[in-house]
Regions:
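Non-catalytic, mostly N-terminal accessory regions of nucleic-acid modification and defense proteins
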Residues: 1-199, 261-272, 365-368, 386, ...
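Switch/connector loops and helix/strand junctions flanking conserved nucleotide-binding motifs
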Residues: 243, 269-272, 288-291, 341-344, ...
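Accessory, often C-terminal, charged low-complexity segments
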Residues: 287-309, 314, 352-356, 389-393, ...
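Active-site lining segments that contact anionic ligands and/or coordinate catalytic metals
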Residues: 277-278, 300, 312-314, 328-332, ...
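Conserved Class I SAM-dependent methyltransferase catalytic core
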Residues: 16, 23, 32-33, 37-45, ...
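Short, contiguous acidic/charged loop-to-helix segments that flank catalytic cores in large enzymes
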Residues: 27, 292-312, 338-347, 367-373, ...
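Conserved S-adenosyl-L-methionine
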Residues: 178-283, 288-292, 297-304, 315, ...
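Active-site proximal loops enriched in glycine and acidic residues that flank catalytic Cys/His/Asp
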Residues: 208, 237, 264, 285, ...
Length: 514
């Protein structure tokens, strides 16, 4: 009797889409191609939203009776971008097979910016460049044209928003080290947001990259039956290209990005939100940044706990975040793990002052390989302006340490992600610890609530491993599982080596000897 065939697991829709789009990339660098693809996804989103509202205005029923479908104010009133005729998706699709399609798309982007001042200098105009084959661009337009089946704006925004976010992550992986400069891994953002729980208030990210922290904050509120309108976001980004991605990423989610600012001087030299006092700060600043213009800011009023060294911005960022917190505000951010132990150039003294001031709430040691742009070990800091209440129990004189180095799983030989279970485990530990009736327990090898006296004993070093100790049980080592993991990693390395050797050989064959 023939064995029944196992059902073939269908590949996720966004993964299929990514493979198809990547195939059309040909010889274009991933860093450039992402603007081409993401710009088109954005254009499809605003065109779908526009067409849906326009059909209601044309029907002229109920509240839309007597409305003019060509009146820009009608669209503005419902937070929908006005899309002129030459920029509508139907027009692009009708012209997708023409050799002039690149020029048509660039003109569409220009027209949208003219009619929507909030998008001025945001959209990419890169489609008529010589390295983008018109046939491939037409294929990409057809591909993206099939993303949102059905015309409901909410469905379209949800699907297109998800695809946009997925593609951001895939482009970051494709770019490797450079990709990490505009993208914080999704699982890290989810962990920060799940721990901070920004249900209501002002959320600030002064180094916002492509806006992932904001998108996740809004998602968090929606998933917990909160009201999205109770959150307002403020951000700043010094890289204009990345800022453009952030503006599109937020617009496709219908999130107001009017307070997400760009200037090339950055948050330290040109703080775009000088007077802002936020309820939440959530950020992933550049690790160990040595080029932050610290020599120009020696007497800055933000350095309340000590002047940070000019050669490393870690403790400048910490104090910048604290400066922007309101009296009951909470900050959660990523830093290089060295920030927990460093004593060079006065950093140890600043850390001591922060601890003695009762500002450090929780430290999380992260697994390796989570970040695309660096192999530097990372950690999360959580700081609270008021540990005595703020809706939680009095935690004055305590710091929670979580060692999450063993969490997460590999998705390829270079990259790891935290699963939903990992995120929940870490976040729940923090919540149980800080809540009034939380059933928190120290777990050897994972978490420990340490007294300020204990931190003093260890000379203000904040490495979680120093506090949590070794796990009670070391005998649950699974040899088969570990062997299989190592074998898979080794096979991936061999494949990558084979690919690189073939590429080198191909390039050598192109060299013509005179």
């Amino acid at each position: 009797m023939a064995k029944a065939k196992k059902p073939v697991k269908e590949e996720p829709f966004e993964n299929q889409l990514w493979k198809a789009a990547d195939k059309l990339r040909k010889n274009i660098d991933a860093a450039e191609y992402k603007h081409i693809v993401l710009g088109l996804i954005f254009l499809k989103y605003i065109s779908d939203a526009f067409e849906e509202l326009r059909s209601k205005l044309l029907a002229g029923e109920g509240e839309y009776e007597g409305a003019d479908p060509e009146d820009k104010d009608e669209y503005k009133a419902e937070n929908v971008f006005f899309v002129p005729e030459i920029a509508r998706w139907s027009h692009l699709q009708n012209n997708a097979k023409l050799p002039t399609i690149g020029k048509t798309v660039d003109e569409a982007m220009d027209a949208i910016e003219r009619d929507n001042p909030s998008l001025k200098n945001v959209l990419p105009k890169v489609y008529a460049r010589g390295n983008l084959d018109p046939t491939n661009l037409g294929g990409l337009i057809d591909l993206i044209g099939n993303i949102a089946f059905g015309d409901a704006k909410s469905r379209s925004a949800d699907i297109l928003g998800h695809v946009f976010e997925y593609f951001l992550g895939e482009f970051a992986l494709a770019e490797g080290k450079k990709g990490g400069q505009f993208y914080t891994p999704r699982s890290v953002v989810e962990l920060l947001v799940e721990m901070l729980q920004p249900y209501k208030g002002r959320v600030f990210d002064p180094c916002c990259g492509s806006g992932g922290m904001f998108v996740q904050s809004e998602k968090f509120v929606e998933e917990h039956q909160g009201r999205v309108n109770d959150i307002s976001i403020y951000g700043q980004e010094s890289n204009q290209t990345t800022w453009r991605l952030a503006k599109m990423n937020l617009a496709i989610r219908g999130i107001d990005s009017s307070q997400v600012k760009w200037n090339n001087e950055g948050s330290f030299l040109n703080d775009a939100h000088k007077d802002l006092k936020a309820d939440f700060v959530i950020a992933n600043p550049p690790f160990n940044d040595s080029d932050w213009s610290g020599d120009l800011l020696r007497q800055d009023g933000r350095w309340k706990y000590g002047t940070p060294p000019t050669g490393n911005a870690n403790y400048a960022w910490i104090q910048h975040f604290l400066y922007h917190l309101n009296p009951k505000g909470i900050a959660g951010f990523v830093l290089a793990k060295g920030s927990l132990t460093s004593k060079t150039s006065g950093e140890g003294n600043i850390r001591k002052e922060l601890i003695e001031a009762g500002l450090v709430d929780c430290i999380v040691n992260l697994p390796a390989k989570l970040f695309l742009n660096t192999q530097i070990p990372a950690c999360l800091w959580f700081m609270s302006r008021d540990k005595t209440n703020g809706g939680f129990r009095d935690r004055k004189g305590e710091i929670l340490f979580i060692d999450a180095r063993n969490e997460g799983h590999l998705i390829n030989r270079r990259s790891k992600v935290l699963s939903e279970e990992d995120i929940q485990k870490i976040a729940d530990t923090y919540h149980k610890w800080r809540e009034v009736d939380g059933e928190y327990e120290n777990i050897k090898g994972f978490c420990n609530s340490a007294s300020l006296d204990r931190v003093r004993e260890l000379d203000y070093v904040l490495t979680p491993g120093r506090y949590v100790g070794l796990p009670d049980e070391e005998d649950d080592f699974d040899f088969n599982e570990r062997f299989t993991t190592l074998k898979d990693e080794f096979e991936e390395q061999l494949k990558e080596e084979e690919r690189l050797n073939a590429l080198i050989l191909e390039n050598l064959n192109k060299v013509k000897l005179v």
